[in-house]
């Protein structure tokens, strides 16, 4: 079963993350980053994460300005989405990877 957590990502920005714990001995840690206009709970992402967690620790997350807020299934943050940039997404990834390096799963 996955568990959710949040990481601050700057002023009025949050990374909403899900951890899928490995179901045995972890071979590795996999971070799944959705593409443009995607989000972690959309389409196949939850199913892929669950399947990979049979042998790996898996983290999925929403970029802070992807348009998905507290309602994890609907596009509700249009103003943030309008301000999204590749630089912002790289910064989000740095924040997540830094957190994971300091808090091993």
Tell what function each PLM region has.
Residues 37-49:
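The serine-hydrolase catalytic nucleophile loop
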Residues 1-25:
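N-terminal cap/lid segment of alpha/beta-hydrolase-fold proteins
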Residues 49-76:
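Conserved alpha/beta-hydrolase
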Residues 26-35:
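Short beta-strand element of the alpha/beta-hydrolase
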Residues 20, 44-45, 72:
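Short amphipathic alpha-helical segments
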Residues 34, 75-82:
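A short, mixed-charge helix-start or loop-turn motif at secondary-structure junctions
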Residues 79-104:
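Alpha/beta-hydrolase active-site loop
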Residues 25-26, 53-57, 102-104:
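Short glycine/proline-enriched coil/turn segments at helix->beta-strand junctions
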